[in-house]
UniProtKB/Swiss-Prot annotation:
InterPro entries: MalF_N (IPR035277), MalF_N_TM (IPR048464), MalF_P2 (IPR029345), MalF_P2_sf (IPR047103), MetI-like (IPR000515), MetI-like_sf (IPR035906). Gene3D superfamilies: D-maltodextrin-binding protein, MBP, MalF N-terminal region-like, MetI-like. The gene is malF. Residues 291-515 form the ABC transmembrane type-1 domain. Its main location: membrane. GO terms for cellular component: maltose transport complex. Residues 1-22, 70-81, 314-325, 403-435, 517-524 are cytoplasmic. It comes from Vibrio parahaemolyticus serotype O3:K6 (strain RIMD 2210633). SUPFAM superfamilies: MalF N-terminal region-like (SSF160964), MetI-like (SSF161098). Part of the ABC transporter complex MalEFGK involved in maltose/maltodextrin import. Probably responsible for the translocation of the substrate across the membrane. It holds the Pfam family MalF_N_TM. Belongs to the binding-protein-dependent transport system permease family. MalFG subfamily. The chain crosses the membrane at residues 23-45, 50-69, 82-104, 291-313, 326-345, 380-402, 436-458, 494-516. This is Maltose/maltodextrin transport system permease protein MalF. One of its GO terms (biological process) is maltodextrin transmembrane transport.
């Protein structure tokens, strides 16, 4: 009995050892994840990326809670999906909507503190400049400055690892050592630019070029309130204009006058970007035109691909047709080729001067359409190309749905004397419409945001005339947003692009809701 108890006593710790290891490994991994993400959060916060830091905290806290608690064991399986949805859908959406209420652009990217720091780092030359030469002596390097025909030299110093910030200049009769080439000065420009040289008369000079030192002083001085800047050159007083996101001169009454000073900083401007969309005719008119074209393009694409796909599916399902498998394979091939390759091939085929399509049309009918310069022909070309890209998908769907329709229905209709039109309208379409509806809605939504087709085929062109932001006749809303964000006439206007993207989100959401309700009514 004692031996059995002794055996149990010996095996108990051994049995619990693997469990202890698992616990240790588990908490070690969780601790490592927490520490790394905590460090990343600190870095983001220190650089002013508060939104990304907050996102990291939320995702990390959720992960530690879910994987660290036994009560939330079941949630471990859905956490990756939830985290992905937050990271790739909810956060970008919220971030985009947030940017829509700011002036964030290529000219207004910095925070207020960073923009102020950039202005305070600016300097200007307040006095004469003096040529200098860098000499290499046996003991080290020496800077020699020429002032009014007199040579002034610094003490000898070691250029490698140079950390001095103040050096006194003393008169010399002749420079010693060899002159360093310009590439040495360029290589060590950062170290040399941080040096203040003290002239015998008490003036300080700093490096103002690759060959000159000059009396350089700060352009702006920060006042006691921590916001106002004083221009030492023009004696102007500047204050931050929180309505436009720039420093701007003010008069004696504190009113903003004159031009703004770059760089700008990000400020909240409320609904100004949305008001620009509706009030600025240079934005409103192309926006409405592009919105209508986007709806028409998406709808026509769905209709054309469905009609062609259904007809071809019916043909390749025809039992009397020989070689159906070969035809089926050939018709599916466009779907197998990557879309961007097909688009670029069509771009060459539709070339107005050397494209094979225009050569064929000119040879047969004597016409040469302006596919890329005429708005109507450009839209026609886009529909042709997109139909080519999309009909194999619809054909595959229709082939499967046609197979699912019982032959008994067609046999019964044949007994009643129905023709193929009656069969199509009374049997085929009703049987196919219900399963096809969600797929047609998905196809409409995909083409609503078909950025790749527009960007690769026409780039949105031909361009509209008289618009405030770049816009083209073949632009979709998504490509229009892209052009505002990255090709804006006044620079990259991310705030306005975010406002347009927010409107697109609301429009697509409304269309999806309407489609779902219509589908539900049709099913009922």
């Amino acid at each position: 009995m004692q031996s059995v108890q002794g055996t149990n006593a010996m095996t108990a710790p051994e049995a619990s050892l693997p469990s202890s290891k698992k616990v240790f490994i588990k908490w070690s991994l969780l601790g490592t994840v927490g520490i790394l993400n905590g460090y990343a959060t600190i870095l983001m916060y220190s650089r002013g990326e508060i939104a990304f830091a907050l996102l990291t905290i939320i995702l990390t806290a959720l992960a530690l809670f879910i994987f660290g608690s036994k009560k939330t064991y079941a949630h471990r399986y859905i956490y990756p999906g939830i985290a992905g949805m937050i990271l790739f859908i909810l956060f970008p959406l919220a971030y985009t909507i947030g940017l829509a209420f700011t002036n964030y652009s290529a000219k207004n990217q910095l925070s207020f503190d960073r923009a102020q720091s950039v202005l305070l780092d600016r300097t200007y030359q307040s006095g004469d400049s003096y040529p200098f030469t860098l000499y290499n002596t046996d003991q080290g390097h020496q800077i020699v400055v020429e002032k009014d025909g007199e040579l002034l030299a610094t003490p000898v110093f070691q250029l490698q690892g140079f950390s001095e910030t103040d050096l006194d200049l003393a008169p010399i009769t002749e420079a010693a050592g060899d002159k360093e080439p310009i590439k040495t000065i360029v290589k060590n420009r950062t170290a040399l630019s941080s040096v203040d040289l003290h002239l015998p008369n008490g003036d300080d000079i700093r490096m103002s070029g690759l060959r000159k030192f000059a009396a350089v002083v700060p352009l702006y001085t920060l006042q006691e309130d921590g916001e106002t800047l004083y221009n030492n050159r023009t004696q102007e007083t500047l204050r931050p204009n929180m309505e436009v996101g720039y420093y701007q001169p003010v008069d004696e009454n504190g009113q903003f006058v004159g031009s703004t000073v770059s760089p700008g900083f990000v400020v909240n401007i409320g609904t100004h970007n949305f008001e620009r969309v509706w009030k600025d005719d240079g934005i409103k008119e192309p926006f409405i035109s592009i919105f209508i074209w986007t709806i028409v393009f998406s709808a026509l694409t769905v209709v054309c691909t469905l009609v062609i796909g259904l007809v071809l599916a019916s043909v390749v399902q025809w039992e009397a047709l020989k070689g159906r498998s070969i035809y089926r394979l050939l018709l599916i091939l466009p779907y197998a080729v990557p879309a961007f390759i097909s688009i670029l091939i069509f771009k060459g085929l539709f070339n107005q001067s050397f494209g094979e399509i225009n050569m064929l049309l000119e040879g047969l009918f004597g016409i040469s359409p302006a596919w890329f310069s005429d708005p109507f022909m450009a839209k026609t070309m886009i529909l042709i190309v997109n139909t080519w890209l999309g009909f194999p998908y619809m054909m595959i769907l229709c082939m499967g749905l046609l197979k699912a329709i019982p032959d008994d229905l067609y046999e019964a209709s044949a007994i009643d004397g129905a023709n193929f039109i009656t069969n199509f309208t009374r049997i085929t379409m009703p049987m196919m419409l219900k399963p096809l509806t969600p797929l047609l809605i998905a196809s409409f939504a995909f083409n609503f945001n078909n950025f790749v087709l527009i960007q690769l085929l026409t780039g949105g062109g031909p361009n509209m005339i008289g618009t405030s932001e770049p816009a083209g006749y073949t632009d979709l809303l998504v490509s229009y947003t892209y052009r505002i964000a990255f090709e804006g006439a006044g620079g990259q206007d991310f705030g306005l692009a975010s406002a347009v993207a927010t409107l697109i989100f609301l429009l697509v959401g409304a269309l999806a809701l309407i489609n779902l309700r219509v589908t539900k009514v049709a099913q009922d």
